[in-house]
A protein has these predicted regions:
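Helix-loop-helix hairpin linking two adjacent transmembrane segments in secondary transporters
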Residues: 151-198
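Intracellular juxtamembrane helix-capping segments at the cytosolic ends
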Residues: 42, 123-136, 143-144, 334-347
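Extracytoplasmic gate region of multi-pass secondary transporters
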Residues: 35-39, 224-285, 370
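C-terminal transmembrane helical hairpin of 12-TM major facilitator-type secondary transporters
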Residues: 245, 266, 272-278, 282-342
Length: 419
């Protein structure tokens, strides 16, 4: 295993430098959140229906958790440098090759766009995030919050930038250019990434008065041990059920408002406010996990999602729906900062990325189930009421799973093992 077979002078490594490199990598990886701007231009170029191209994007989201799982496995075997470079190459190749797919073979998009981009981005995301978090056992929430804020917030400027390049040239040029730029930047940053040593304690760290040790000072559980614990299955349940409101709304933000007769300009504003809430929630609530613990912050996320659901179900004004979008952005967005802390707290930092990837399989299943149930209920009832009631139940089931996760008593490591 990489973490036990290499030697590293910890004092020669600036953990803030690792953080900055990781944030830049995650910023580039965040382009996956802006891929909706490619749907209409690609549909026009290939002569497909927009819904068919959107299905290519949905398939990409199915491969993404698998890439994340693989990224966590590669991180523990080969370290942060190797995994981020591998992810950058695969992810960049997906964008570049999508830009080269001829109009006579649009089916190749399922390989270049769905498979390569999805897998490569998942590898990059998980590898960079958990590599960074390994260096901040004393500030897990802040590190996760920064990573998620940069990753989620990048679409705020990447989406309009990609749209501008597409309008000025064409979508093929945009994809090709983005692939080269993202790959080069991520590879250069990846060259400076290093995994933290076992039992790593930051220089100058002062232990709390109660004598509690950092999670890195206890034995880390591999997935072969983790999956036998109730902590793993409760986390999988939390990650599967909690995002219900998001999975209902993520492809319907604009449609929901226009269906209510609200002007499209407000619908666009709603998406922007959702993104702002998402970034703020990831950063601020992520930081709060260091002070309050992940369970209390997770309950705050649930409360925000409940407020969102009530506003969506009963709201008749533009202001109420816009507020619902902000609450959903903050509530769901912050869970992306909570889950990494949940994994490292229960199982330690060494295998947390791999465990996180396995727990994402529950979410992956729900990305296929909930949107289909939503579409069927909307078609049969003509409204969202049934779908929202389902979301209230599932989201509540998710938070129950999260807050019921008991502390896992792991053996304390007596000696520092460096990498």
């Amino acid at each position: 295993m990489y973490l036990m077979s290499q030697t590293l002078d910890v004092h020669s490594i600036n953990r803030n430098g690792i953080l900055i490199r990781g944030l830049i990598i995650l910023l580039c990886a965040g382009i996956i959140n802006a891929t909706s701007v490619f749907i209409t231009p690609l549909a026009t170029y290939y002569g497909w229906e927009a819904s068919a191209i959107a299905n290519v994007g949905t398939t990409m989201l199915t491969f993404w958790p698998i890439g994340s799982l693989l990224g966590g496995k590669l991180l523990q075997k080969f370290g942060g440098k190797a995994v981020t470079i591998i992810g950058a190459i695969v992810f960049g190749a997906g964008l570049i090759l999508t830009g080269l797919v001829p109009d006579t073979a649009p089916g190749l998009l399922y390989f270049t766009y769905s498979f390569l981009i999805g897998m490569g981005n998942g590898i990059t995301y998980c590898g960079a995030m958990y590599c960074v978090m390994g260096w901040f056992p004393d500030k897990k929430g802040l590190a996760a919050g920064l990573c998620m804020a940069f990753n989620g917030g990048s679409s705020a400027f990447l989406a309009p930038l990609c749209a501008y390049i597409t309008a000025a040239f064409n979508v093929k040029v945009t994809l090709f250019s983005c692939g080269i730029v993202c790959a080069v930047i991520c590879i250069l940053c990846g060259l400076g990434m290093r995994s933290a040593p076992l039992v790593y304690v930051p220089e100058g760290y002062v232990a709390p008065s109660d004598g509690a040790a950092l999670s890195s000072q206890y034995e880390s559980y591999p997935i072969s041990k983790a999956w036998k614990t109730k902590q793993f299955w409760l986390q999988l349940g939390a990650m599967a059920f909690f995002p219900s409101f998001y999975l209902i709304m993520f492809s319907r933000f604009s449609m929901f408002m226009t269906d209510k007769g609200i002007d499209l300009a407000y619908a666009t504003l709603g998406v922007s406010l959702y993104n702002i809430g998402n970034v703020v929630g990831r950063l601020l609530l992520g930081k709060l996990t260091d002070n309050l613990g992940f369970k209390k912050v997770y309950m705050c996320c649930w409360l925000l999602c409940m407020i969102c659901g009530l506003l969506l179900l009963t709201g008749s004004s533009v202001a109420m729906i816009l507020l619902a979008y902000i609450c959903l952005g903050a509530g769901f967005g912050a869970t992306n900062s909570v889950y990494p802390v949940m994994s490292t707290t229960s199982f330690g930092p060494v295998y947390a990325g791999n465990i996180y990837g396995f727990a994402l399989l529950g979410y992956m299943l729900m990305t296929q189930v909930i949107p289909r149930i939503t579409a069927a209920t909307i078609e049969s009832t003509g409204g969202y009421t049934v779908a929202f009631i389902m979301a209230f139940v599932l989201c509540t089931l998710g938070v129950i799973c999260g807050v019921l996760i008991p502390k896992l008593e792991r053996p304390r490591l007596k000696e520092t093992e460096s990498v």
